[in-house]
Regions:
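Beta-rich carbohydrate-recognition and catalytic domains
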Residues: 1-44, 48-115, 126-131, 137-187, ...
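Internal helix-turn-beta structural module
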Residues: 192-204
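Conserved beta-strand position repeated once per blade in WD40 beta-propeller domains
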Residues: 44-46, 120-122, 193-195
Length: 209
């Protein structure tokens, strides 16, 4: 990430919301004591495959996967994306090359809009409905000044962990709200770091609390 990230320039993958000291691991904003955060980066990847032949990023050979990752820049609603291409003659074989995806214009695509992309999320494809399901944390006040946050909120304003929600999409880009999974009674009652699996017509969800 540091090879691609330059805090002094507004570049394609975004810019950290607060000023940071690259030598200080946990201090994005020295003016807000107690409101610290891990350093910026892309992490906690989801491995997905695009199976719709009409999609711009569809690979008819079946050898392309996409990594959709938490975009930790202290903002909310975005995720990072990378493309992984298998070099073998058949899917599942050969060396795997990681690169950036591209827009139809030819420009590199490094970030996409994704509800809850600022925290760990889980994407699951359902072949029956042909939909991607997204389990993620809902942020409600990421633009509140850090010094004005309630005492029971940890770290930065976008780091809200007690509202777990569900979305669905047919293309990984356009997400529709499906419903609320769980809400903790207070900001300290976390409902996040969740995962899910399909059981016939049901979604089984496991969540940190």
């Amino acid at each position: 990430f540091r090879d691609e990230f330059d805090n002094d320039k507004l570049i394609e993958q975004g810019r950290f919301f607060y000023p940071i000291d690259p030598l200080d691991f946990y201090l994005p904003d020295p003016s807000q004591p107690g409101r610290n955060s891990a350093p910026p980066g892309w992490l906690e990847s989801n491995v997905v495959q695009i199976v719709d032949p009409d999609h711009y990023w569809f690979d008819p050979s079946g050898r392309t996967l996409h990594l959709v990752m938490r975009l930790h820049l202290a903002n909310s609603g975005y995720a990072a994306v990378l493309k992984v291409t298998e070099q073998g003659d058949t899917p599942g074989t050969g060396e795997m090359i990681t690169s950036f995806e591209h827009f139809p214009s030819g420009g590199e695509c490094r970030i996409i809009a994704l509800p809850g992309g600022q925290m760990k999320f889980h994407i699951l494809y359902d072949p029956c409905t042909k939909l991607y399901w997204l389990l993620s944390s809902q942020t409600t006040d990421s633009m509140t000044k850090a010094q004005h946050m309630p005492a029971d909120r940890i770290n930065l304003p976008n780091n809200e962990r007690h509202r777990l929600v569900l979305h669905f999409s047919k293309n990984l880009i356009d997400w529709c709200f499906a419903g609320v999974v769980a809400i903790g009674q207070t900001a300290l009652d976390a409902r996040h770091y969740a995962s899910m699996m399909i059981d016939d017509q049901d979604l089984c969800i496991l969540s940190r609390s």
